[in-house]
Amino acid sequence: MSKSKAKGTAAERDTVRYLQFYWPLAERRALSGNKDRGDIAGIPRTAGEVKAAVKIELAKWQQETLTEMQNAGADHCFLVIKVPYKNVSKWDFWMPAYQLGLEDLRFKDLKEARWVRMDFELGRDVLKGVIAALWAAP
């Protein structure tokens, strides 16, 4: 396994462990061909992507995450970016603003979605609330 692949696998593993506090069934998703559905499975109606790279390609990764959400047939998505030398709880956690109710779906294409960044600790709690609200909706 290459060094960069090993870093990515370790970041996914650490992300899953952190998410299992609320979602015990969270797990790394096995690769699934050309219709990638994200790196994380086991969170209801949600696709998760994890990145651990030296070069940050935020716009590209956000678009990948939205595509994976669509491929997975999910309602929500998130992107976790490992921050070197920080505890997993302080890694960057990104979600599209519309999923948080912060903007209307005024844009015609998901590519126009704006994103909100928070630390992973807050992001995990926010995601829990967003999913709970989804299940409580009539």
Regions inferred by a protein language model and the residue ranges of each:
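Catalytic phosphate/metal-binding cores of nucleic-acid and nucleotide-processing enzymes, i.e., regions
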Residues: 1-138
